[in-house]
Amino acid sequence: MNRLYIVFICLAALSSCEKVWEDDLQEKALDAVRGRYEIASAVWEGTEPIDIDGDGNASYDYYAEWNQVDVGWHPQHTVNNRLGRLDIPYTYCENDHWGGLVFLERRYERLEFDIEVVIEGGESRLEFTLPDEDSQLTLSGYGELTLRTDVTFTVIVSPEETREVTGPVLFKFKRIEYISGE
């Protein structure tokens, strides 16, 4: 009976160690993505180049096109001072998100997503929620994230004419600041 009791205590201790190990692994994985990021590049992956800044020159360089958009035609089209910055963790209004990317200060040009670290078989992976189910967010290097997702944005053709475009964009982010989890 004593041996069975000792085996039971050892199994209980061993199972609690595994939980601590998983928690530690999850915290390390979260720590690896925590921070403030800037866009290093954004590439339009559509079949044809796009011209979203209305200058007549189409390009696959989504970031360059996007940065040249004249948002001054209309008072509501103001560039947010956090243009192109990704924060993990991120809080906007009353919604808590593990990630948030601000394009322009307009409701429909804000991309917010939740990131969760999932532990399976001793390996961690990032899981996240975006409107586009085919989106992929990966930790591509130390302090580097890659996000491939469909983006819908408004093209201001003239003060009187706008159009919406949706298509795949590959974003690459570089961490510029660590955000502590404490």
What are these regions (language model features)?
Residues 45-49, 93-101, 152-165:
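Short, cysteine-centered beta-strand-loop-beta hairpins and adjacent loop/turn segments enriched
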Residues 60-71, 77:
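Short solvent-exposed strand/turn elements
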